Curated annotation (Swiss-Prot):
PANTHER family: DELTA-1-PYRROLINE-5-CARBOXYLATE SYNTHASE, GLUTAMATE SEMIALDEHYDE DEHYDROGENASE. The gene is proA. The lineage of its organism: Bacteria, Bacillati, Actinomycetota, Actinomycetes, Mycobacteriales. Belongs to the gamma-glutamyl phosphate reductase family. PROSITE patterns: PROA (PS01223). Gene3D superfamilies: Aldehyde Dehydrogenase, Chain A, domain 1 (3.40.605.10), Aldehyde Dehydrogenase, Chain A, domain 2 (3.40.309.10). It comes from Mycolicibacterium vanbaalenii (strain DSM 7251 / JCM 13017 / BCRC 16820 / KCTC 9966 / NRRL B-24157 / PYR-1) (Mycobacterium vanbaalenii). It is an enzyme of class 1 (oxidoreductase). The keyword Transmembrane does not apply. It holds the Pfam family Aldedh. It is found in: Cytoplasm. Keywords: Amino-acid biosynthesis, Cytoplasm, NADP, Oxidoreductase, Proline biosynthesis. One of its GO terms (cellular component) is cytoplasm. This is Gamma-glutamyl phosphate reductase.
């Protein structure tokens, strides 16, 4: 007997039922002690490791299907797991357990002249939806950060990673059950039908925020169609600007690291800007180094290439007139992610840092450092490229809201 896929109304009901269960779990999570959450995170790390073979077998099946479908190598790298990566995923959970708990943190407080005592403190957001592409590590990163910040999470991953994500979520839910916690604190939504994304991002009143992680097409679609608040993350047309004062040895190392370390991630450099004052020397040296490393340099880039997030061994080259030319170019073509300047001129560095519109600005450092772990936040939920309510690598504080608590002593407000 064949089994029919659920109809669209059935899928909508399925997603909304999951969201309702998540709301119940979120209410319980909000009042958990830090000790309980940390113990659950460490248990989750243990369960991930105990299920390494199952997880890797599932990932192998995903990779085989992706290769058969002609998936580009850069995307296969994002999808792939191995024993070291699984161990890294488990370590990430333990790192989150070691981070300060943001819930209950008092941000500010004061006593009013009438004697009322005010304090503003952090509280969980509630139910967080994550829509993401073929990166299984996001499954566990999202779980770890949402659990520690007292939120429930609804995960809608890519169909290309469906088996890997299911194996990981099964391990995480088993860990929650071991600790006597509500397993609906983490749920994996169906990935076979794209309508599940629509039902998630339009579940107003059930989902508190949706965070899309992936390429420009995914992010634009979620932001455009969502009826719940969204936090835009990740599209990275990151530039490295080599100023006329730059040490070219340093510039070469930074450019190569920013482009070639992991070209498929959002903090990889996609554009190289060279000051016209040193173009005669810097262009052949830096493009030669990139070419030798296997990078295709687009020396006469089209408008589309100047705006591209290649996510591959490609980089656009542009010559600009000094620091102001670089600032103007970046503010036209950048995506607000990470921008870097290589310079020995303090004034140029300060001008660039102040006037470039980006979540992170690197001075004499690779764009690859824009990362929650590198910033000391532990795992990250994403890198926000918007300005409200979070910007840059999103750690635990960015997964909270605030509540005002006011203490009185029979206070009433005069007419």
């Amino acid at each position: 007997m064949s089994v029919q896929a659920p109809s669209v109304p059935d899928l909508r009901q399925q997603v909304h039922d999951a969201a309702r269960r998540a709301r119940g779990a979120a209410r319980a999570l909000a009042s958990l002690s830090t000790e309980t959450k940390n113990r659950a995170l460490c248990t989750a790390a243990d369960h991930v490791l105990m299920n390494t073979r199952t997880i890797l077998d599932a990932n192998t099946a995903d990779l085989d299907a992706a290769r058969a479908a002609g998936t580009p190598e850069a995307m296969l790298d994002r999808l792939a797991l191995n024993p070291a990566r699984v161990e890294g995923i488990a370590d990430g959970l333990r790192q989150v357990a070691g981070l300060p708990d943001p819930i209950g943190e008092v941000i500010r407080g004061r006593t009013l002249p009438n004697g009322l005592q005010l304090r503003q403190q952090r509280v969980p957001l509630g139910v967080v939806g994550i829509v993401y592409e073929g990166r299984p590590n996001v499954t566990v990163d999202a779980f770890g950060l949402t659990l520690k910040s007292g939120n429930a999470v609804l995960l809608r991953g890519s169909s290309s990673a469906a088996r890997s994500n299911a194996a990981l979520v099964n391990a995480l839910r088993a860990a929650l059950a071991t600790e006597g916690l509500d397993t609906d604190a983490v749920q994996l939504l169906p990935s076979e039908d794209r309508a599940s994304v629509t039902h998630l991002i339009q579940a107003r009143g059930l989902v508190d925020v949706v965070i899309p992680r992936g390429g420009a097409g995914l992010i634009d679609a979620v932001v455009r169609d969502a009826q719940v608040p969204t936090i835009e993350t990740g599209v990275g047309n990151c530039h490295v600007f080599v100023h006329e004062s730059a040490d070219l040895d340093m510039a070469e190392e930074i450019v190569l690291n920013a482009k070639t370390r992991r070209p498929s991630v959002c903090n990889a450099a996609e554009s190289l800007l060279i000051d016209a004052a040193i173009a005669d020397v810097a262009v052949p040296r830096l493009t030669g180094a990139l070419t030798a490393a296997g990078v295709t340099v687009h020396a006469d880039p089209s408008e589309d290439e100047l705006r591209a997030e290649f996510l591959s061994m490609d980089i656009a080259l542009a010559i600009v007139d000094g620091v102001d030319g670089a600032i103007s170019h970046i503010n036209e073509y950048g995506t607000g992610h990470t921008e870097a300047i290589v310079t020995t001129d303090l004034a140029a560095a300060q001008r660039f840092s102040e006037r470039v519109d980006a979540a992170a600005v690197m001075v004499n450092a690779s764009t690859a450092f824009t990362d929650g772990e590198q910033f000391g936040f532990g795992a990250e939920i994403g890198i926000s490229t918007q300005k409200l309510h979070a910007r840059g690598p999103m750690g635990l504080p960015e997964l909270t809201s605030t509540k005002w608590i006011v203490w009185g002593d029979g206070h009433t407000r005069p007419a």
